[in-house]
Curated annotation (Swiss-Prot):
Main location: cytoplasm
InterPro entries given in the database record: DNA_helicase_Holl-junc_RuvA_I, Hlx-hairpin-Hlx_DNA-bd_motif, NA-bd_OB-fold, RuvA, RuvA_2-like, RuvA_C, RuvA_C_sf
Pfam families, per the entry: HHH_5, RuvA_C, RuvA_N
Domain notes: Has three domains with a flexible linker between the domains II and III and assumes an 'L' shape. Domain III is highly mobile and contacts RuvB.
Protein name: Holliday junction branch migration complex subunit RuvA
Length: 193
């Protein structure tokens, strides 16, 4: 599986990207939330990816944050939700908005997304209940302690730690700590476990 790609962004054509990785160009589909936060073409980009292997294709989906990728994976577990629809959900609302809709059981909010009818919205609410809120709450708590929580978490995940381990370690990082110092403190906390 390809879990992360770092390289030069060659093309941007929503929702498709072409990223050059040491001479190999990877086509990656991304949600619009990721697309709008990408660097300019010709610049370096790092994406967390989800690879899907089908009979007729190997597909890559990219995300800037671990939360987006985790949510994408949770959406794929739901019957009737494929990669395209999961991408549409993440393009139509942020992970935080989706978690809020799930917490409030707001089916009407989900039906505003393209391709999501009432039954699909209700299935999403049922299947995602309790799966998004805890992680987002943990990240929000960590973010209040460190201004660079997302960057530190991305670095820890890139080093092979799970998101859960990373979130627990970030709780030991004081507010106002820089990214590099925050990573050191988080790694120190992880080494004690």
């Amino acid at each position: 599986m390809i879990g992360r790609i770092a390289g030069i962004l060659l093309e941007k054509n929503p929702p498709h990207l072409l990223v050059d990785c040491n001479g190999v160009g990877y086509e990656i589909d991304v949600p619009m939330s990721t697309f709008y936060n990408l660097p300019q073409t010709g610049e370096r980009v790092v994406l967390l990816t989800q690879q899907i292997v089908r009979e007729d294709a190997h597909l890559l989906y990219g995300f800037l944050t671990p939360q987006e990728r985790t949510t994408f994976r949770e959406l794929l577990k739901i019957t009737g939700i494929g990669a395209r629809m999961a991408l549409a959900v993440l393009s139509g609302m942020s992970v935080q908005e989706l978690a809020q809709a799930v917490t409030m059981q707001d089916a009407a909010r989900l039906t505003r997304l393209p391709g999501i009818g009432k039954k699909t919205a209700e299935r999403l609410l049922l299947e995602l209940k309790g799966k998004l809120g805890a992680d987002l709450g943990a990240l929000a708590g960590a973010a209040s302690q460190s201004d660079h929580a997302a960057d530190i978490l991305n670095a820890l995940v890139a080093l092979g730690y799970s998101e859960k381990e990373g979130l627990a370690a970030i709780k030991n990082v004081p507010a106002g700590t820089g990214v590099s110092e925050g990573i050191k403190l988080a790694l120190k906390a992880l080494s004690k476990v």
